[in-house]
UniProtKB/Swiss-Prot annotation:
The gene is gpa-13. InterPro entries: Gprotein_alpha_su, GproteinA_insert, P-loop_NTPase. It comes from Caenorhabditis briggsae. G proteins are composed of 3 units; alpha, beta and gamma. The alpha chain contains the guanine nucleotide binding site. It comes from the Eukaryota. This is Guanine nucleotide-binding protein alpha-13 subunit. Residues 38-51 are annotated as: G1 motif.
Length: 349
């Protein structure tokens, strides 16, 4: 599969029913049967795990509560401020100056602002953000965004600031998919497709959260593992030393070698193929992977898939599937998830 997400046929998602469950997997006894096909969603932080969970909820009619909308709305404001602050810092470090000199002062005030901003922006702050984002030099810097860490949804939310920064703003389905909301604790959703009930567990992917993973291992029928291949040049936020791709591959290796998952199928989602392909022209893969022999985008994608498969070790080929995807692309994920769920049900027969 190449880098383009177009050309996918419209998918007919089956009629479904859904509900939420807050019961941790660890509360089930080992001899108790489960009424759902149980799925565990794993991956490092910012790999796209939660986006996959949100796609499942939206595609399979798992409606959000008002409190969940409120929670996500708060993080959307937080995302916007973090993005503009990251851009201002990148501008300060770059060889580009603002086209409008007044924006230099605005940028400095954004950088100096230590508030987390989980709510609607003041009129003054919103105007600063809009002016900085509209600056021609800032747009030139944004075109070079692959050279620094920036949330993939930055342009989406900054371009929609007028709509978002209102008292009656309620996130749309697209907003929910584009927002980055870190997973806290164990989240799970129960949904029904084609008369089969599934339960999908999502656990935080930061190092401090991974100790909780083992509490969810019992009775799992399949694993979804998200790996953001675009992170080949980035460092982990926890230590700013460890390469994110190396960490994710090591994590995948650990999961594959876990004795409790010896016969559990792993569905590997190689996420952010669009960002990956965009980066290649600016940040050569060979700068970070000396074992990459070179080639075009398809060669680079094949190389990344081979790295992931190698991390699975001696796992039998029948016990894993690899998919290249863009987790924020709802149509692509609808087709992918439909294929995956059918494969899981086939294994259970």
């Amino acid at each position: 599969m190449g880098c383009n997400s177009s050309s996918l046929n419209k998918l007919q998602v089956p009629e479904v029913r859904a509900s939420r469950s807050n019961t941790p997997a660890s509360q089930k006894s080992s001899d108790q049967s489960y009424s759902h096909i149980r799925l565990l969603l794993l991956g490092s932080a910012e790999s796209g795990k939660t986006t996959v969970l949100e796609q499942v909820r939206l595609l399979y009619k798992q409606h959000f509560t008002e409190s969940e909308y409120f929670h996500r709305r708060a993080f959307i404001y937080h995302n916007i401020f973090k993005c503009i602050k990251s851009l201002c810092r990148a501008m300060k470090m770059s060889d580009i100056g603002f086209a409008d000199p007044i924006n230099m002062g605005r940028s400095q005030s954004i950088i100096a602002d230590e508030e987390n901003h989980y709510g609607i922006f003041s009129k003054e702050l919103a105007e600063k953000i809009k002016c900085i984002w509209a600056d021609k030099s800032m747009q030139s810097l944004y075109a070079r965004r692959s050279q620094f860490n920036l949330n993939d949804s930055a342009a989406y939310f900054l371009n929609n600031l007028d709509k978002i920064n209102t008292l009656d703003y309620k996130p749309s389905d697209r907003d929910l998919i584009m927002a980055y909301v870190p997973t806290c604790g164990v989240q799970n959703v129960i949904f029904t497709a084609s008369n089969q009930s599934f339960q999908l567990f999502d656990i935080g992917g930061q190092k401090i959260d991974r100790r909780k993973w083992a509490t969810q291992y019992e009775g799992i029928d399949a694993i979804f593992f998200c790996l953001a291949i675009s992170e080949y040049d980035q460092k982990m936020n926890e230590d700013m030393v460890t390469n994110r791709l190396d960490d994710a591959l090591k994590l995948l290796e650990t999961i594959s070698e876990e004795p409790m998952f010896a016969t559990t199928p792993i569905y590997l989602f190689l996420n952010e193929i669009d960002v990956f392909c965009e980066k290649l022209d600016v940040i050569p893969l060979s700068n970070y992977r000396k074992d990459f022999p070179g080639g075009d985008q398809d060669d680079a994608l094949d190389f990344m898939e081979n790295l992931a498969v190698a991390a699975l070790g001696k796992r039998d080929k029948s016990l894993y599937r690899v998919y290249r995807c863009i987790a924020i692309d709802t149509q692509m994920m609808a087709e992918l998830l439909s294929t995956v769920f059918k494969d899981i049900m086939k294994r259970k027969r």
